[in-house]
Amino acid sequence: MAMTELLNAEDIKKAIGAFAAAESFDHKKFFQMVGLKKKSTEDVKKVFHILDKDKSGFIEEEELGFILKGFSPDARDLSVKETKTLMAAGDKDGDGKIGADEFSTLVSES
């Protein structure tokens, strides 16, 4: 499934552009801009599974660094600092990875 089957391509493009500068990523604003915040829990979990590149059932820190590329292949990677900030916000149980339920919570808190 492509991300554009769940989210509007123009919204994705605008959101990626808004956070093109290094160290500018704000997951709350990003999730709102791409329209993820308005989606059902089921659709948010579909987005999670697209972002879970290795299909482990979790988004690990390495995958998290490439989260923007999951929305648009030409997007930038997150910096180490941005990645760690996002992991800290999303990893509710402290196991070093974000599960589908944790991702849904992260989006709903945006």
Curated annotation (Swiss-Prot):
* Positions of modified residues (N-acetylalanine): A2
Positions that bind Ca(2+) 2: D91, D93, D95, K97, E102
GO molecular function per UniProt: calcium ion binding
**Signal peptide interval:** none
Q: Which InterPro entries match?
A: EF-hand-dom_pair, EF_Hand_1_Ca_BS, EF_hand_dom, Parvalbumin
The UniProt record lists the EF-hand domain at 39-74, 78-110
Residue positions where Phosphoserine is found in the record: S24
Q: Name one Pfam family in it.
A: EF-hand_7
UniProtKB keywords: Acetylation, Calcium, Metal-binding, Muscle protein, Phosphoprotein, Repeat
Entry-linked CDD domains: EFh_parvalbumin_alpha
| A Gene Ontology cellular-component term | cytoplasm
The yes or no answer to whether the keyword Acetylation is present is: yes
Keyword Phosphoprotein on this protein?
yes
Something else the entry says is:
This parvalbumin has an isoelectric point of 5.50.
Task: Give the matching PANTHER family.
Answer: PARVALBUMIN ALPHA
What family does the database annotate?
Belongs to the parvalbumin family.
Q: What is known of its domains?
A: AB domain, comprising of helices A and B, is involved in structural stabilization, protecting the hydrophobic core of the protein. It is required for high-affinity binding of Ca(2+) and for Mg(2+)-binding.
Q: Give the protein's biological function.
A: In muscle, parvalbumin is thought to be involved in relaxation after contraction. It binds two calcium ions.
Q: What is this protein called?
A: Parvalbumin alpha
| Record gene name | PVALB
